């Protein structure tokens, strides 16, 4: 009969402290690797080890993470780039593996094509948070399968014949979209755990508020304070450390185009928050509440808000100070005073900036950032590249790479961002979204399109990606084939699909072999002693027509 006080056989109490100390030493040794030379951890090895269980699990994600780091480190040092695109499904991941050294999993694509609720929708991160990890698993399992299949094929051939066979690296590291983390810090940690368990090598997380998250190229984006996003990055690193994995964390900022922020609590955000400079106006929220109570609705309310905004003369505090300096008759050499103010106020809180302005003899300034707040309570912010740089510098010690979401494929803006970040952290790796939301034809001529990736790489953008290329290429060939098929029947399949597959040597033309039928036949034969009357690739298989 079992004892009520059974001892855990995995832990000998007399050795528990020694085992703990040994594991702490191992973690400290791990963290001393050059891989972590720029990484800041606000927690200790003791804290990490105490959160681990007794069973040590080796995650494939760790091997993939190390591989990804080696790729990006090498590319960055050479001012080169790894570039890829959003992968939809296993067929695509096997074809990408021939030519590209990383794979991207897009939250946008997953939202529209692979939600774990089966309910499609736009990129608002309102799908279950298992959605993107499940897509990572879908692709990673395919990578593992095709790697096994290829290895079996090669080892089944004489060594002298193997040079004629494919030797594709199917295990390309996967970087996935973690959106805003789908909740609080424990949600971020659980999401990170899921990604690691599913095989991701890296994840990116953005500084938007979770409940109002938008695609990077939609309006209405609401930022969280810098401190909150740093906490998310720390949560990712802590969870990966608990699991013993070198997972890459990429910090994305949406500050370039953001117009709102949840709170003014972080002084690092103060310089970018907009305030009303018209003292004659009542707070917007009060005005709107009164209008609603009087029966105003819809367009009437919008007109009232638009009129208030036009009169409010919203400005950043620094801009308000400079305007007062330039218009004040009591200030001599306004240009010099403005320069002194801007230099002294950089990075300061609003309270400190007010004190600096006063010390320079600037008249008292009316600046009220509470007055323009939205009905949800959000503060208004003037984003821009300078705002994104400010955030990127704050995130850098906690992120392996940084990405600024932008409105256009603007090389000069990309250069400004890179130079701003590298002025403080010269070794910071950068990422860039080669978005299909951009109109590339109007953005730049074709010769510049061809060199754009290379030019960005020279600035330190060592990982670049087209988020939705999988979606768009699938839509394009589907539309083209469906139209032709409806018009000319099987001729469309021959001309648009099968013949090009054969001419280009696309392995999927032999789809039975591609799917692993030969490999699975060999599994059956192994189990049945070498003979199987039901082998899928035996006599009669129609794929013989393609030899």
Swiss-Prot record:
Its cofactor is Mg(2+). The keyword Transmembrane helix does not apply. Substrate binds at residues 106-108, 216-217, 252, 433-437, 467. GO terms for molecular function: isocitrate lyase activity; metal ion binding; methylisocitrate lyase activity. GO terms for cellular component: glyoxysome. Disruption phenotype: Leads to reduced virulence and a delay in the expression of rice blast symptoms. One of its GO terms (biological process) is tricarboxylic acid cycle. Homotetramer. This is Isocitrate lyase. It comes from Pyricularia oryzae (strain 70-15 / ATCC MYA-4617 / FGSC 8958). The gene is ICL1.
